[in-house]
Amino acid sequence: MAEGGFDPCECVCSHEHAMRRLINLLRQSQSYCTDTECLQELPGPSGDNGISVTMILVAWMVIALILFLLRPPNLRGSSLPGKPTSPHNGQDPPAPPVD
């Protein structure tokens, strides 16, 4: 204990505060018990209705598929039979004039 009867540790961690934390910990970890059985979780609807990693991955795959199907024609690999594949119809471009 420090001089004058003042204990700085008492301000941070008092006996009452430690007992409250212990009681809260015990209350939270207790099982729900009846006369015939003890359950770890309370009966009723489950609270696990959050978004899972699988749902996020499926959503990204759907977005990727939609973007793939809606891409512009110039990014598609196939060309129409009557259209040339390049501006020079498969031939080398003409040489630049020599000065």
Curated annotation (Swiss-Prot):
It is found in: Endoplasmic reticulum membrane. InterPro entries: Uncharacterised_CD034/YQF4. It is a single-pass membrane protein. Residues 1-49 are lumenal. Keywords: Endoplasmic reticulum, Membrane, Transmembrane, Transmembrane helix. GO terms for cellular component: endoplasmic reticulum; endoplasmic reticulum membrane. The keyword Membrane applies. Residues 71-99 are cytoplasmic. The chain crosses the membrane at residues 50-70. GO terms for biological process: blastocyst hatching. Residues 78-99 are annotated as: Disordered. The gene is SMIM14. The keyword Metal-binding does not apply. This is Small integral membrane protein 14. Its main location: endoplasmic reticulum.
